[in-house]
Amino acid sequence: MLNKNKRWYLIALYDIYQGLLTTKQCEYFNLHYFKDLSFSEIAELKEISKSAISDCLNKVCDQLLKYEQALLIYEKNKKRNDLYTLINDSELVKKLKDI
């Protein structure tokens, strides 16, 4: 079981990189992380083995981490948002976020 921080981190990465995953990978990720179904429940629903679900979701998580390691989109967004908190001009922050 993932701790909450890693779970939310993977969900954030999924929001960024889901377009790089297959339809099946997205479906299993959604069922597990957003619908909160267990591997067993997904396996029963999709009529495949629990280990196939586990393998697929482990691969998805590995892929998401590799994409972030290479592209750093999440990290750059986080740094940018941290910098926004240092700016006292709310209009400027709004304009920067709109870019």
Curated annotation (Swiss-Prot):
It comes from the Bacteria. Pfam families: UPF0122. Gene3D superfamilies: Winged helix-like DNA-binding domain superfamily/Winged helix DNA-binding domain. InterPro entries: RNA_pol_sigma_r3/r4-like, UPF0122, WH-like_DNA-bd_sf. HAMAP family: UPF0122. Might take part in the signal recognition particle (SRP) pathway. This is inferred from the conservation of its genetic proximity to ftsY/ffh. May be a regulatory protein. Belongs to the UPF0122 family. This is UPF0122 protein UU142. The lineage of its organism: Bacteria, Bacillati, Mycoplasmatota, Mycoplasmoidales, Mycoplasmoidaceae.
